[in-house]
Amino acid sequence: MNDIHFLRRLGGIGALGLSCCIVPAGAAGGGFDAANIGAAPAGWTCGSTGGGSPRWTVEADATSGEHAPVLKQSGRGKFPWCVKKDTSLADGWVQVRFKPLSGKEDQAGGLVWRWKNGDNYYVARANALENNVSLYYTEAGSRKTLKYVDAPVAAGSWHTLRVEFVGTRIAVFLDGKRYIDHQDDHISGAGAVGVWTKADSVTAFTDFTYAASAR
């Protein structure tokens, strides 16, 4: 699929890298409800692929922009995830702002899409300890690497991660720059979208948005 066709399928946004951090009209999602401070976000389901004790809570954060609450993962698990229950996208895009706060083993922030359950989904993540962006698929609970690319990921700073996906085409952006453009057919059909971390990563998320592609 060429760039122009990919762009049209996404409704005039994306794969050419011109609008990575712009949220167009019609996008769903947004911030997290202050009524859920100290608790898991309403309308989301959270867990960890491979076990562990993840802790997903909505927290106050004065650095998030307009003092909006953030979703924070402060526990530990092999691959913690938290997905929005009412989402089902086969093709489209998903975007989030994230801040790596701490972690000795990892300082990762990621996105999941075509999420069928805790053992089957795609994930793209950025890691402040490794300074890279990577793309994986998870099947039957086993994570497989598709691509790694070096990228600057400063700890303690906000970054914007975005994934665009149509058919077998996947594009991954960090802070407005496309780092990965890959073809893969392991996981197809509609699934949920959400956020992801790894190991002991303590990570904050805000401005979670998504949309299905134009038909």
Model-derived features with residue positions:
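Bacterial N-terminal signal peptides
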Residues: 11-22
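Extracellular carbohydrate-recognition regions
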Residues: 26-49, 206
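Ligand-recognition surfaces built from glycine- and aromatic
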Residues: 31, 187-215
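Short tryptophan-centered beta-strand motifs in secreted/extracellular beta-sheet-rich domains
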Residues: 32, 94-96, 157-172
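Extracellular glycan-recognition surfaces and repeat-rich motifs
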Residues: 39-70, 77-78
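Secretory/extracellular carbohydrate-interaction modules
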Residues: 73-135, 139
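Short, aromatic/His-centered strand-loop micro-motif at the edge of beta-sheets
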Residues: 139-160
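Short, solvent-exposed beta-strand-to-loop segments that form ligand-recognition rims
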Residues: 173-194
